[in-house]
Amino acid sequence: MSAHFRSVALIGKYQSADVAESVFAIANHLRQRGLVVWIEQGTASSIGGAADFTVASYEEIGSRAELAVVIGGDGTMLNAARRLAEHQVPLVGVNLGRLGFLTDVARSDALQRLEEIVDGRYSEESRFMLDAEVLRSGERVFQTLALNDVVVNKGDLGRMIEFDLSIDGEFVYTQRSDGMIISTPTGSTAYALSANGPILHPGVGGIALVPLCPHALTARPVTLPDTCRIEIRLLPPHDASIHFDGQARFDARAGDCVRLGRSPLAVRLLHPEGYNYYAMLREKLHWSAVPRHN
């Protein structure tokens, strides 16, 4: 059977002791299939021994690769997704991490599953991203994308912060808390889940606002349409840290405004044949597990 994809880039988890074996096994297997194989330059530098393969930057991968295989955990996938979003390169994840909500191909059968995907046997879904910016005195001082979430929190402070929340230009409330998680459906099974936020199906066009330890019994998570524009303004004298997918960080000052909404960019995520969202949740979250009695 002829390959559905002709070129593939491999992106591995940096500074991981066991990623090299998986990267080389996949690279050699795909090259034997006749595919052009690139290894992302940071990955190549981290694992060493990649002289037999072409090393490529994210920009080169975005312009030349037809598929990117991300080998690591969800954090590796989040980074790759942000870096490649504007290029619309489809991504598939091989899980070397823990839960792996985004990297759903098991290492044990990665070669077989990737063989199926290369042959065109896969399902594809689009995951929307958040476009976030920080304004200071009306001027943009930071901007980035987030696939999972944007988190405004108290940072190193040993006390709560205070901020105003506005949606589509309308004031909603002033809140005192440890912060706020603004989550996409993709991020609803990450930090937001730990803060008692709702699980949002990837097909839901919604953005979840999940307070962190609010100083009010009535403060509850709220799900908004993904057409909303959200603003959080820090009130004096409180500074805060703003985290994007738990990777990029910006230290905000009192008076700064975080503005965000759905980005026009989206991530193309490929799943192996037979993938089922509910089965994935059942496995990762141990739904229907039988209690053990010692």
UniProtKB/Swiss-Prot annotation:
It is an enzyme of class 2 (transferase). It comes from the Bacteria. One of its GO terms (biological process) is NADP biosynthetic process. It catalyses: NAD(+) + ATP = ADP + NADP(+) + H(+). NAD(+) binds at D74, G75, N148, D149, R159, R176, D178, T189, A190, Y191, A192, L193, S194, Q247. It is found in: Cytoplasm. GO terms for cellular component: cytoplasm. Involved in the regulation of the intracellular balance of NAD and NADP, and is a key enzyme in the biosynthesis of NADP. Catalyzes specifically the phosphorylation on 2'-hydroxyl of the adenosine moiety of NAD to yield NADP. This is NAD kinase. It comes from Azoarcus sp. (strain BH72).
